[in-house]
Amino acid sequence: MDSTKEKCDSYKDDLLLRMGLNDNKAGMEGLDKEKINKIIMEATKGSRFYGNELKKEKQVNQRIENMMQQKAQITSQQLRKAQLQVDRFAMELEQSRNLSNTIVHIDMDAFYAAVEMRDNPELKDKPIAVGSMSMLSTSNYHARRFGVRAAMPGFIAKRLCPQLIIVPPNFDKYRAVSKEVKEILADYDPNFMAMSLDEAYLNITKHLEERQNWPEDKRRYFIKMGSSVENDNPGKEVNKLSEHERSISPLLFEESPSDVQPPGDPFQVNFEEQNNPQILQNSVVFGTSAQEVVKEIRFRIEQKTTLTASAGIAPNTMLAKVCSDKNKPNGQYQILPNRQAVMDFIKDLPIRKVSGIGKVTEKMLKALGIITCTELYQQRALLSLLFSETSWHYFLHISLGLGSTHLTRDGERKSMSVERTFSEINKAEEQYSLCQELCSELAQDLQKERLKGRTVTIKLKNVNFEVKTRASTVSSVVSTAEEIFAIAKELLKTEIDADFPHPLRLRLMGVRISSFPNEEDRKHQQRSIIGFLQAGNQALSATECTLEKTDKDKFVKPLEMSHKKSFFDKKRSERKWSHQDTFKCEAVNKQSFQTSQPFQVLKKKMNENLEISENSDDCQILTCPVCFRAQGCISLEALNKHVDECLDGPSISENFKMFSCSHVSATKVNKKENVPASSLCEKQDYEAHPKIKEISSVDCIALVDTIDNSSKAESIDALSNKHSKEECSSLPSKSFNIEHCHQNSSSTVSLENEDVGSFRQEYRQPYLCEVKTGQALVCPVCNVEQKTSDLTLFNVHVDVCLNKSFIQELRKDKFNPVNQPKESSRSTGSSSGVQKAVTRTKRPGLMTKYSTSKKIKPNNPKHTLDIFFK
């Protein structure tokens, strides 16, 4: 009977510890905790919050019970082994101790409440809190004497202090004041780390070094009267102190009374300032030590905002945070930068004072008899066996007085969210409406930061304080309110349907977006063929703009680039080089080039014409984007009809002129350089020249029409016979190879289907056909313009190009290589048929024909556009 009663009393004490007052905050020393906790328990008993706290307390007690059982099973041998391991780690930490930095933690005193009291002087001597009846953000020091503190429900605070005035928050005003404070902090450390609106870390080590050589004039500031305008520039006028400032400011300067100048001392004040009756010529000269620098910071903050700040000075961030709470409000504390001073400070420090140790960890450590940091160090071996590696590492850092000395500012954001707490909402319409509001607010925040994400998460807390999070990841990034709400609505609908027929009773809802693409993802993200063509088009435009300023010898040739580059980088490089050939052709054959200008130049002229036509008040003169001819004042329907006609019959002669120009340019450059070209016919030849860098590019099926359909076979035979001596033997390879673009008298540009030639050049330009990009679609593999605007047919062509190597192997097995068909131009329909045949056939035996240095083919030989762009 007695044991049951003792157990009940112990459980009640544990609940009081969890739900009772946490007095580890400035201004709450010496309070009657028993009386305050009794009021808190009476105000919450029977509520859902009380029931939720009971459930959490049971969970914590269960964890402690499991921990004590684990402790009982630890042997002395395990303890000795753990002791050696922890001591070895402690020795490493001790050797890495860094005492060379001076870290300052600035914390504004009761920031939100202080701003409200400044703007409404009637509140100065009254207990006030900022927040609502549901939750308080902060309280002033008058209210703290009654036990009212931040993170306390307003209705409980009213029980503790009936005369408490609760002021609604005004975050725009708080942000404006915070900006003023941060402007001052940036003068001492441009890379300071802001933790919130009222809290920041500074590393003033560099400032202290520079300050040693500063004259007094640079360290002098004047004390102002009630004006909140700060005297940033030393040597300017000052006004009289207000009564409030007189009661605060002198405390800052007790250690340096000789620095205060008596009234009437000119001290670099000009004649007008001396004769101004509003000026009280009190100036303060701050020293060069860390203490003096922090006094100066706090003085400037007070002069500019009329608000006070507390500060901690220490060798690392952990100690500086604890020090700033030591002499609150309006005070500062320093730990000298030596090991003995650090250990003396840590010795009797309660573990709850350290940031990162909350009420649950405090209770678990208390069950092991650990209350101070000294006891934390004494039990280090036991803690390493009972807690996770991350936890006991952190405990050991605390017990040795170690912390971070590196301030990281504006790290990469991982997510952005918005959430609201409210009274119970159980109607689906209201829940959807609230979700839409949250999505709109989140979209605005994303727009300000210029962020987009792929994962949308909703957070729901029901009336029983049970929290659920549901997430959905989409393939493309989203950022608008409509896109986010479309995803969040489905997630919310799933939860509503899960509770049907009972309503979903919520008291909190939040929406979060994450999975932001990083810089590397944004750089290489290619999701569609259109996107690929646009990217290539932009690359060509950039090349055209910078080509005149760049020496031709400084260009990086495609065959000399690194093998490690991606396929898209290689293709862009080839297209850039092809465009460079076209530009050189303009210098060599200026007259002939005028009749066939490069596409980008024509496009530029077209854009200029469009801009002129848009600004015209008369009828618009439209230009065809295909033939680039002005169409006069015609309707959009007529222009569309004309564009369709142009797309059905492109100018082949112009295309051939561009090709011929590119070939002539490349030939002349090679003649100038007199660099011999050697064919890559054997592997030994490649190994004999290891310094030569090569890039292979596929020579896929061209699928282009010739001018005269009746001369297809003859043109192919002519090409094959003319260059049979120049080309190497066909090498079966998965790598991509670059083939010569030959000048042909029949004005036919075609590539053989079955022959994959490999080609190498030593430090010379490759022959590349002119790549024409723009309105028409160009295959990203073979760089051949397709005479179709149908994306389905275009995709079929790309599939055929991607599967060329499989088609070749299949055809070599089924047919005699000597009697291969000579037609190089096939319709897209037949290409589709070949593609289907390839996807139905697996030829694992063909892998043995490849060199061991080649990449192993996956089990599924089917190449799709989705895989290609991944």
From Swiss-Prot:
Pfam families reported in the protein's UniProt record: IMS (PF00817), IMS_C (PF11799), IMS_HHH (PF11798)
Chain residues that bind Mg(2+): D107, D198, E199
Protein name: DNA polymerase kappa
GO biological process: cellular response to UV; DNA damage response; DNA repair; DNA replication; error-prone translesion synthesis; nucleotide-excision repair, DNA gap filling
Tissue: Detected at low levels in testis, spleen, prostate and ovary. Detected at very low levels in kidney, colon, brain, heart, liver, lung, placenta, pancreas and peripheral blood leukocytes.
Zinc fingers typed UBZ4-type, residue spans: 621-651, 776-806
Chief location: nucleus
Positions bound to Zn(2+) 2: C779, C782, H797, C801
Compartmental location: Nucleus
Organism expressing this protein natively: Homo sapiens
Keyword terms of this UniProt record: DNA damage, DNA repair, DNA replication, DNA synthesis, DNA-binding, DNA-directed DNA polymerase, Magnesium, Metal-binding, Mutator protein, Nucleotidyltransferase, Nucleus, Repeat, Schiff base, Transferase, Zinc, Zinc-finger
Family: Belongs to the DNA polymerase type-Y family.
A single cellular component GO annotation: nucleoplasm
Ranges where the record places region Disordered: 816-858
Details of cofactor binding: Divalent metal cations. Prefers Mg(2+), but can also use Mn(2+).
Keyword Transmembrane helix carried by entry: no
Subunit structure: Interacts with REV1. Interacts with PCNA.
